[in-house]
Amino acid sequence: MNILIPNSWLSDYLETNATPQQFADAMSLTSVSIERIEKVGDDFVYDIEVTTNRPDLMSIVGIAREASAVLPQQGFTAKFKPHTVDHTPTTSKSDMLTISSDPTLINRIMAVVLEIDLHASPEYISDRLTKTGVRSINNAVDVTNYIMREIGHPSHVFDYDRLNNHTLNIRRSKKGEKITTLDGKEYTLPGNDIVADDGNGTIIDLLGIMGTANSVVIDTTKRIVLFLDNNNHNLLRKTSMNLGIRTEAAVLNEKGVNPDIMLPTLVTGIELLKKHANAKVISPIIDIYPNKTKPKTIKVTKDKIDSVIGIEIPQKTVVDILESLGFGVTVKENEFTVEIFTSRVNDIDIPEDIIEEVARVYGYHKIPNSLPALTEQANYHQDKNEFYWIQKVKEAFKFWGFTEVYTYSLVTEELFDGPIENALKLKNPLTEDKTYLRNSLVPSVIDVANQNKANNLQLFEIANVYLKKNKGLPDEVLHLAVVVRKEKASFFDGKGIVESVAKILGITTISFEKKKDGIEGADIMLSGKNIGSIEADEDITVEINVQELLKHANSKKIYKEPAKFPPLIEDVRVEIPAHYPFAKIEKALKESSELVHSISLLDVYKNKKTFRIVYLSRTRSLTTGDIQPIRKGIEDILTTQFKATLG
């Protein structure tokens, strides 16, 4: 997710000698990615991409804290000026506002009632909001957007006098309930959504996502409820995606915002409303906090940090980095005890997470490149993992003149292979036409071929397909698909491709069985299991279960001494019924004599086939007299066992 942050606003919390460009370069190298800097008048606005696991950086304060750790490691001075508020008493109940909640739905709720004068915001607030891409509305609404960008927790304002019974009853929605959001759009709720009603069943807020039109601040508003809620982010995301409401508040809340920053956010909002809306607090601050964040500490030794990173980082540097990031650190001899601040409890779990924080802030670019030390006796070998074999196969296809394609995992109904009731359908697809997860690669690769005007095409793709199961999650399986479109292409092109791939993987037990469904082609068999198929229609297509194939991959090379004596080669032409597979014929002929070295299919015309037979002895040179009885035995096998007619 991207946010816009003005440099002038950031300077309220960060004191540094880095120029805007130097700031952007240093942060992009070790932290967030600053994609663009735009000069706006005398100010600079940073366009910052924040990764989904760091909602704590979706604010001015969060970026300032992060920069105070990063910049000193890049040679700049940087001081974080923390956001502080005075201690403020709170209560769980108030006569002016009744809030009932479900602990399974909310982590924390805070609210306060204020009298205000509603009017336009001062210029500095509207200017700052405009630079962050937010339209100024009025001083009450603008304050909620302002404190969200500054501190990082969304908030909302209700018109207090439009709340029937002055009640907020937080509950799960019922399927079919309708709401009209503050932008005037009507939605039918799917059910199980987190909502607030007025105590009589009328929904007045879609919590954490968007307010409703029946409780929003209007021109005549005199009293407001400043409201902050921290909810079950899994339910919230589901609602947001189902309804297609992707407000910044929804996106931020679904990441799991830190509930401990709610009090400073609320107090800051109150102070801004006092200053710019002549606000008077007319109720206690309500604070309902059933699911408090549990503190977490992680221990890691200095030796482990140095071992994992590969260089020795001074102890003081480690402490400075961690403390600048907001962690509490105590050191006892060689061990660091790190207290995880609440904004990072969902992100930092194990010692390696701490080490990663130290390494990235210190700067990966400052760690010298070096090979691992090996002793003379070390038995070094390259691990032949899945990635290795896939790269070998891809390189081979490119060498053979194939083009690799990448297609979408989501497909239309037309590109789903088989009955549509077997398809995995998304509840919230990004586009209406692509709603199904593919169960085969071939239809998509053929679709790519159809969009190409060339008549001679050789395409391949290696990617995952998704197979529905009766119970549990679907299977995600790696497949290879090949499409050959050229003049005079035949089944044997596909067969040759499969055999060549098997050879690269060191597999010698691939076999083929004629398809039983009447389609011209063959099933690909390995260890008695069907792992794919070849089909010869308008195009020659191959699809193989790569995961099954790789289980048998073997990098061990078996050396055979070359024969010292020349082979004898004969061609045998026969007419043979089409239903006999070559693999079966080859097996029978090779077993007829130990001198039959190899059998290959040289030519095919309808049912007429020409086999090339290579005879070889490793002890002597063969003569025509040696092979005559073997040749007679081969002819007998072909005529009796395979009903062939010699040509």
Where are the predicted features?
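His/Asp/Glu-rich mid-to-C-terminal helical/loop segments that flank catalytic regions of hydrolases
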Residues: 260-278, 448-453, 457-460, 628-634
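Short histidine-centered catalytic/ligand-binding loop motif
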Residues: 130-136, 251-258, 430-434, 480-491, ...
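An acidic, glycine-/histidine-flanked metal-binding catalytic module
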Residues: 246, 266, 270-280, 478-497, ...
